[in-house]
């Protein structure tokens, strides 16, 4: 009997290394990373980070673009994939923070269908005006808006530039006419051309126009000043203490993905973020590295979603 027990125990112990190796084998094949936009800033950043992770884990991380519906197309696709760590989503955080309260019919649940791996970077927006606008500070712009009608451009209804503007102007208590465009590019062109008076836009996208005196920068929306424009104050420093609006990139996985895989990928993102060329990329693009782990990343998405839900409701913003 004891011999039988010893034989069985030996057989079980012999299997343990093989089982452990199988459990630690991730990734054992290429990982597909779905990017929710066409090639552009998000795509470029996803490629940089995924290249670093691929080198570290010794498996390809293959980028595939699935653009459409402000990230909803990509999210719906990834939601339907096996929760095994081999299909991930790299998206702008608004897919999970803005789209749920903005779209009446959403093809995914941001909480039930996904798990956060990392929110690696955040970035603010810069409040700019056409040089003809007689306001050189946020306070002067607010006072001016109280005495005469002013307007602001955005990249479209529900876009980040629309949301941060609606949030700020409602906070300041001044009426502003919203002029939406189909994309940020044309909105910037029309503010430079003097056809629209003000605009919030990603700092890295307008800083060259500020330096060329085609736009005047009044403030940035993030809690910290931008390294690209250190002399430009924050909105919080300009009379609105606590005002802090940043958007972010998010690496997500289908709900049910094993936690050890989620934690591994999170650590790999942080390793990538610490590499000198990524640090320089962050500086040049005005990205602030967060150091967020999966739990902190999930909390970021929840708090941002709650804020934007209120802004969307209070300002009657809709895309349907």
PLM ranges: what are they?
Residues 22-112, 148-151, 157, 161, ...:
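N-terminal (or domain-start) structured segment
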Residues 38-40, 93-94, 122, 130-135, ...:
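Short coil/turn segments
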Residues 28-30, 170, 259-320:
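An extracytoplasmic/periplasmic, membrane-proximal ligand-sensing/linker region
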Residues 122, 206-274, 303-306:
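C-terminal lobe and pocket-closing loops
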Residues 53, 80-86, 101-186, 235, ...:
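Hinge/capping helix and adjacent helix->loop/strand transition within the periplasmic-binding protein
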Residues 15-22:
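N-terminal signal peptide c-region/cleavage motif recognized by signal peptidases
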Residues 1-9:
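Bacterial N-terminal signal peptides that target proteins for export
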Residues 95-105, 167-171, 198-232:
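A ligand-binding cleft/hinge motif common to bilobed small-molecule-binding domains
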């Amino acid at each position: 009997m004891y011999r039988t027990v010893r034989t069985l125990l030996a057989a079980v112990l012999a299997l343990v290394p093989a089982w452990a190796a199988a459990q630690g084998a991730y990734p054992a094949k290429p990982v597909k990373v779905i990017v929710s936009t066409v090639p552009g800033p998000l795509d470029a950043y996803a490629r940089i980070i995924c290249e670093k992770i691929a080198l570290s884990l010794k498996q390809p991380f293959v980028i595939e673009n699935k653009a459409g519906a402000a990230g909803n197309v990509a999210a719906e696709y990834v939601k339907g994939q096996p929760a095994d760590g081999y299909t991930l989503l790299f998206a702008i955080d608004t897919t999970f923070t803005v789209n749920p309260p903005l779209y009446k019919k959403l093809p995914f649940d941001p909480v039930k269908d996904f798990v956060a791996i990392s929110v690696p970077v955040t970035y603010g927006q810069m409040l700019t005006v056409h040089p003809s606008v007689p306001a050189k500070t946020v306070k002067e712009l607010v006072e001016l808006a109280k005495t005469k009608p002013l307007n602001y451009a955005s990249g479209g209804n529900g876009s980040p530039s629309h949301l941060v503007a609606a949030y700020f102007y409602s906070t300041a208590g001044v009426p502003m006419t919203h002029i939406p465009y189909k994309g940020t590019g044309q909105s910037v062109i029309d503010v430079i051309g003097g056809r629209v008076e003000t605009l919030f836009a990603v700092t890295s996208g307008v800083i060259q126009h500020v330096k060329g005196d085609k736009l005047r920068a009044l403030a940035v929306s993030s809690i910290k000043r931008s390294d690209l424009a250190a002399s430009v104050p924050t909105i919080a420093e300009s009379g609105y203490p606590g005002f802090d609006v940043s958007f972010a990139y998010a690496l997500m996985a289908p709900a049910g993905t094993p936690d050890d895989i989620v934690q591994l990928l999170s650590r790999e993102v942080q390793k990538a973020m610490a590499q000198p060329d990524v640090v320089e990329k962050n500086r040049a693009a005005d990205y602030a590295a967060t150091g967020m782990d999966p739990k902190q990343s999930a909390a970021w998405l929840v708090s941002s979603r709650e804020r934007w839900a209120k802004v969307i409701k209070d300002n009657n913003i809709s895309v349907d």
